[in-house]
Every structure is written in C-alpha cells, then in structure tokens.
C-alpha cells in the first residue's frame, strides 16, 4: 500500500491515538489529551496535513496560510517510520497541494524544534530544497 497525504478535518478515535504516538516526543503530555488533539485537528486558523500508511497515521505537519505564504509547524514523523522517505513524501505532496492553491512561499521556524532534533531536521529540510537562514527554513514554490 502507498503513502497517502490528506488534511485531517474529521476527528476519529484512531486519529487521536495515532497523533498521541506521532507527537509523543514533541508535545508535553498535557497537549496529548483527546481534547487538545481534537482542538489541533479542528482549529480554523490552520490545517493539519497527515500522512498515512496501512491505515495508520504516521506523520503530521500543521500549516497556516497567509496570502501566498504557508507557514509550517509541528512537523514530525513517527519514530518507527523515520528515514524511509515518509517526511519527504509528506512535504512533496503538501507543496504540490499548496502550489495548486497559489502559494508561492513556505517557511518553517526551526526554533520550535527540540535541540536534539535540530541538526537532523536542518539536514532533512536542506535535502528537501529548503534554504536555511537564522533558524528559518524557506522554499520558493514553482
């Protein structure tokens, strides 16, 4: 089965369980409750893009749109599935979707990334075509 990418806009028990696993090392425990994750999924100011494999959600990124710029946050892939192209596929599909909507720029503030993850995240984003400058990763969409 292939990877799929979609915007999570409907809360399900499985989605909440999977988000708790995806964000276990990212959010404090208080942010992993069903209520907190439901708010993350349903907030109107942003979209939660998910990647799925074999009926399990294995990665997520939050996206805020402002005119022609998209701002990424909370990008993470479940530990067990890292380094297998899941994150690259998520970004590729996300960028394709945003380009179709008329977005021209993407940025990600790396100050939110845990220090132990920073070098790997910088390398991942650089390898995905992002320019790094003072904790901000940017990419022009074509």
What are these regions (language model features)?
Residues 1-32:
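Short amphipathic alpha-helix that is part of the acyltransferase structural core
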Residues 50, 56-64, 69-76:
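Conserved beta-strand in the GNAT
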Residues 18-22, 36, 89, 93, ...:
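Alpha-helical elements of Rossmann-like donor-binding domains used by nucleotide-donor carbohydrate transfer enzymes
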Residues 27-52:
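Active-site rim helix/loop that mediates acceptor-substrate recognition in acyltransferases
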Residues 77, 83-96, 123:
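Conserved acetyl-CoA-binding loop-helix of GNAT-fold acetyltransferases
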Residues 109-116, 122, 126-142:
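Conserved catalytic-core motifs of GNAT/GCN5-like acyltransferases
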Residues 98-113:
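Conserved GNAT acetyl-CoA-binding A-motif
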